[in-house]
């Protein structure tokens, strides 16, 4: 990477990190802490509170992405982070679960993911973009690992209200990074092609990735509706869950580094991509089996490690592929569609996951997740290997 590419990658990764740390801090304790609110014993409503963030973010990802093509990436990022900070403040104040849903919905309205990834794509060459996207993915993963350690500890002192207040402060910090550290945008942007969104929606290779990111994040979020309770049943107190999460996340980073980058250079990215999808399908099947009994801590830890191995590979490679195949003139729109499906996946995972657990139990949730991953594997199977420095063709 050039110095400019390193600065761009590091600063944009930090923005993602600050924003995602706030989101991740509440995730491990949300389902348990939400029970303290009026109506908190309703698993479907708790799932809605977890997932509504993804619905509003999904609705606004495309408008924010198109706006970043027209008005510039950095102004859109500042506006989005400001909205996110206000939503976090409302969630911190929320006296009821319904107000918490409202705050989470406003959090999601700060839909900057497309603008951030588009700016990163603008400022990096194709040949190093997977590394740049992986740096962003690694920063998100590290924030997740950090939140697993801090979340139960902080929640015991400041509760869910305090965690949301911290989230608001972190978003303000992200605004400072955008203004003072992110490199200036290119002075001249390619004008967005007329009908760019429609052309993106007709792009077969992008549609495969859009479907995949929806399934991946629906499955990821739905897991957290059931996993904390399963770990408690396994004999691990809530404030000890990080002892399972943290080693699994950190070890999976080493696996990603040892597999994704070397195999991509050798032309095996398609094989690694498909293997990672199959791996997560097997994880969901294993969780379905474990949900039929009181699982031990070690089997749960092993399953989570395998999950994060597959998840990290997909989280690093998918946005890189999307940015590489997207037309340059409508890159913001293309990544807006991609991030819309990602956000809708979050919403579906929370809402449908909560409903399934409430109506049919964790077994039904993990069975549905297994089938969803197998469907994605079938869709992704037809993709061609990405061409060097360009992307992948539609199969």
Regions found by a protein language model. Name each.
Residues 1-6, 182-212:
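Juxtamembrane intracellular "pre-TM" segments in multi-pass secondary transporters
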Residues 54-62, 144-145, 249-257, 346-347:
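Residue-level signature of mid-helix packing/kink "hotspots" within the transmembrane helices
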Residues 59-95:
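Conserved MFS/SLC helix-loop-helix module at the cytosolic interface between two early adjacent transmembrane helices
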Residues 60-72, 254-269, 357:
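Helix-to-loop junctions at the C-terminal end of transmembrane segments
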Residues 70-80, 265-278:
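Cytoplasmic membrane-interface "Motif A"-like loop-to-helix N-cap segments
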Residues 103-141:
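Cytoplasmic helix-loop-helix junction between adjacent transmembrane helices
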Residues 168-187, 379-384:
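C-terminal membrane-cytosol helix-exit motif in multi-pass small-molecule transporters
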Residues 270-318:
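C-terminal transmembrane helical hairpin of 12-TM major facilitator-type secondary transporters
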